[in-house]
């Protein structure tokens, strides 16, 4: 099937690096594809239908690779990647085409596909692996435009680092018993009776 024919992670990264090295004069984006709530898709329609969806996506991407000569890859789960021009119209065309794969025949639930983009020219020091990582960060940080296309910005990475730092600090504080728990009474202003408690940390 198509999933066995599409390049896996290491092969794709090598193909992508070779492609970018030989097409430096053109503007490219590395794109990560995300089927939003794919686990829910599996839950609703079964893993067989989920596997069929992945196979259909892989088939479309292999057709794209055959006609365009640009690398595509599959990293497992629902993680697909491709290289495409830094051109909004062509990017939107890809989203529309691939969306047909995830629009189910069942009309009760609609699933959407998103594209996370990392513009290669904006990150000249990044290798293929870093570009893919940035594209994955972008696809998980929707801009609420409704377009299904999310472009990487360094602020996304800064936000992830800040979140991780906060989680580390919270874990450290829990380990060292640095939180104090208080119960503040809530009183009826007329009867002055205690009617509840408010938890404060």
Where are these regions (language model features)?
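A short pre-motif secondary-structure segment
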Residues: 69-75, 109
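Catalytic/regulatory signature loops of cyclic-dinucleotide turnover enzymes
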Residues: 107-108, 131-154, 169-180
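Short amphipathic alpha-helices in soluble, non-transmembrane regions
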Residues: 94-101
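Interdomain signal-transducing alpha-helical coiled-coil linkers
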Residues: 9, 156, 160-167
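Active-site core of bacterial EAL-family cyclic-dinucleotide phosphodiesterase domains
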Residues: 15, 162-201
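Catalytic strand-loop-helix junctions within cyclic-nucleotide turnover domains
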Residues: 83-91, 106-108, 112-131, 155-159, ...
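Conserved long alpha-helical elements within nucleotide-processing catalytic cores of c-di-GMP signaling
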Residues: 2-29, 36-63, 73-77, 81, ...
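Beta-strand residues that line the small-molecule/cofactor-binding core
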Residues: 30, 110-112, 178, 196
């Amino acid at each position: 099937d198509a999933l066995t024919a599409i390049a896996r992670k290491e092969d794709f990264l090598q193909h992508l690096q070779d492609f970018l090295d030989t097409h430096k004069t053109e503007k490219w984006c590395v794109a990560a594809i995300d089927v939003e709530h794919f686990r829910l898709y599996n839950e609703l329609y079964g893993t067989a239908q989920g596997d069929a969806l992945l196979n259909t996506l892989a088939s479309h991407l292999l057709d794209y690779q055959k006609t365009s000569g640009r690398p595509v890859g599959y990293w497992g789960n629902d993680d697909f990647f491709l290289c495409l021009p830094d051109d909004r119209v062509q990017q939107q065309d890809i989203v529309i085409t691939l969306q047909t794969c995830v629009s189910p025949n069942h009309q009760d639930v609609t699933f959407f596909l998103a594209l996370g983009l990392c513009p290669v020219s904006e990150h000249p020091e990044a290798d293929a692996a870093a570009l893919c990582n940035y594209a994955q960060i972008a696809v998980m940080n929707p801009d609420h435009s409704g377009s299904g296309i999310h472009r990487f910005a360094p602020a996304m990475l800064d936000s992830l680092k800040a979140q991780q730092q906060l989680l580390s600090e919270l874990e450290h504080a829990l380990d060292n018993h640095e939180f104090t728990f208080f119960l503040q009474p809530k009183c009826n202003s007329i009867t002055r009776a205690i009617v509840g408690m408010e938890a404060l940390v």
